[in-house]
UniProtKB/Swiss-Prot annotation:
Outcome of swapping S363P: Increases protein stability and enzymatic activity
Top enzyme class: oxidoreductase
Encoding gene per record: FAR8
The protein's Enzyme Commission number: 1.2.1.84
Alphabetically ordered keywords of this record: Lipid biosynthesis, Lipid metabolism, NADP, Oxidoreductase
One Pfam family matching this protein: NAD_binding_4
One GO term of the biological process aspect: lipid metabolic process
Name of the protein this chain belongs to: Fatty acyl-CoA reductase 8
Catalytic activity: a long-chain fatty acyl-CoA + 2 NADPH + 2 H(+) = a long-chain primary fatty alcohol + 2 NADP(+) + CoA
Gene Ontology MF terms: alcohol-forming long-chain fatty acyl-CoA reductase activity; alcohol-forming very long-chain fatty acyl-CoA reductase activity
Organism listed in the record: Arabidopsis thaliana (Mouse-ear cress)
Family from the record: Belongs to the fatty acyl-CoA reductase family.
UniProt function note: Catalyzes the reduction of fatty acyl-CoA to fatty alcohols. Catalyzes specifically the formation of C16:0 fatty alcohol.
């Protein structure tokens, strides 16, 4: 790294896809805050036209609390001026050729100006429709690469993936690119990405010919995605399609420098722009909130498994540092796994104790205003034991309530429906999170560790006071969860 990240960002023109997503917004806010002399940020969002894209960015990004530090520092007028001068909203869709941009003049101008392409666009639904997952996570990534190749000044494509592209492998998981020719399942079945697309198209055609409803088509396309993922050794459609996206990028990058960022479970900001900002319930957050509300009393978890989390601002810092390091490099194909399991692990057993401590002292309130009392969550280490426990402890009593409902419908009907809904919610969470809560892998992050060390040297040399720190060892997990992350969820997600 020959100069600081702040200097690197100066006068750069950067394209960011998926710009209304959680991580992309943290990334964009950081750039605007630390380097207002960035030349231009082209922000691609799905919208009918550029006017709609502008409105969507304003309401879903710039008016959010995330930008309050910039707003407080600059004032409304100066912030609006900065945004109008530096940000260009672009209506687009990476699932389409030319990123779905209809304005050819704008597209040509972008391809003359852009220095760095950052692909953050993704669908993160674990059980996404296979056609949508392939369209965005797999071939959408290839569309971004093809666009980047047409940018005459392009110095780098930075692609955000996920650490869980590894599948369900145990042990130390290498920080290296996929080699497509080596990808086959335990029975030796070779993965053919083009065949996967053809299978998806054929199934979609069959469903259309059968006159299947939209709801039915969604169901069957979700089933197909999960079926194909598990056949090839991945737990769900999300990580399977993200894996194939990485493979296509590696195979088709040619001479364009390529950096792949693989974050683990992204959580609320640790420091910047302020502690605790988050949007939506992400991965373990659904479990945290359900527990705090008294809905979740038991869960499928190995108490000794590591919960690999990383704050969003650390991921954004790693993205900027990686771009500054590799932009313009020859034949670069670098992978950075950004997580905490290797250097600063926390196990689910510790998290259970922290959650019990927090919600005992900071009880949430029910709809009628009463305080919700939580007990220590029961953690069950296997799916078979969990299913047995749920049947004996909850399902059989609920069936008795159903019988009462039939005999005395006005008496216990609401209680039966309420309890049944809670059971369904728990089982849905368990099925979605099973591959992660029983995960036995640790993510090797030597590349990221070396990058972080170099970044700290640069920050020291340039008196930037660790402005781009992403060292997981600085996270004090108990303090972070109790004083930052859970309060952030309650403030920014539950709006309480």
């Amino acid at each position: 790294m020959e100069f600081s990240c702040v200097h690197f960002l100066q006068n750069k023109t950067i394209l960011v896809t998926g710009a209304t997503g959680f991580l992309a917004k943290v990334f964009v806010e950081k750039i605007l805050r630390v380097q207002p002399n960035v030349n231009k940020l082209y922000l691609v969002v799905r919208a009918s036209d550029n006017e709609a894209a502008t409105k969507r960015l304003r309401t879903e990004a710039f008016e959010k609390d995330l930008f309050k530090v910039l707003r407080d520092n600059l004032g409304d007028e100066k912030l609006n001026t900065l945004l109008s001068e530096k940000v260009v909203p672009v209506a687009g869709d990476i699932a389409m050729d030319h990123l779905g941009m209809k304005d050819s003049n704008l597209r040509e101008r972008m391809q003359k100006e852009i220095d760095i392409v950052v692909n953050v666009a993704a669908t993160t639904n674990f059980d996404e429709r296979y056609d949508i997952g392939l369209g965005i996570n797999t071939f959408g990534a290839l569309n971004v690469l093809n666009f980047a190749k047409k940018c005459v000044k392009a110095q780098l494509l930075l692609h955000v993936s996920t650490a869980y592209v590894c599948g369900e492998k145990p042990g130390l998981l290498p920080e290296k690119p996929f080699v497509m020719e080596e990808i086959c399942n335990e029975n030796g079945l070779q993965l053919d990405i083009n065949l996967e697309r053809e299978l998806m198209k054929q199934r979609l055609k069959e469903l259309n010919e059968q006159g299947c409803s939209e709801e039915g088509t969604t169901f069957y396309m979700k089933e197909l995605g999960m079926e194909r993922a598990k056949l090839h050794g991945w737990p769900n459609t999300y990580v399977f399609t993200k894996s194939m996206g990485e493979m296509l990028l590696g195979n088709h990058k040619e001479n364009l420098p390529l950096v792949i960022i693989r974050p683990t479970m992204i959580t609320s900001t640790l420091f910047e722009p302020f502690p605790g900002w988050i949007e939506g319930l992400r991965t373990v957050d659904s479990v945290i909130i359900a527990y705090g509300k008294g809905v979740l009393k038991c869960f499928l978890v190995d108490v000794n498994s590591v919960c690999d989390m990383i704050p969003a601002d650390m991921v954004a810092n790693a993205m900027i540092a990686a771009a500054a390091t590799h932009a313009g490099g020859s034949k670069v194909h670098m992978v950075y796994q950004v997580g905490s399991s290797h250097q600063n692990p926390i196990i689910y057993g510790e998290i259970r104790e922290i959650l019990f401590c927090y919600f005992t002292k900071n009880s949430l309130r029910s709809r009628n205003g009463s305080m919700i009392t939580v007990s220590k969550m029961k953690l069950i280490p296997t799916l078979a034991l969990f299913s047995l426990y749920m049947t004996i402890r909850y399902k059989l009593p609920v069936q008795l309530l159903k019988l009462v409902d039939i005999i005395y419908p006005s008496r216990e009907g609401d209680e039966y429906k309420n309890k049944n809904r809670k059971i369904d919610m728990v089982m849905r969470l368990v099925k979605l999170y099973e591959p992660y809560v029983l995960f036995k892998g640790i993510f090797d992050d030597r590349n990221t560790k070396n990058l972080c060390a170099k970044q700290k040297e640069e920050d020291n040399r340039n008196s930037e006071n660790f402005m781009f720190d992403f060292d997981p060892k600085i996270i004090k997990w108990k303090d972070y969860l109790i004083n930052v992350h859970i309060p952030g969820l309650i403030t920014h997600v539950l709006k309480k």
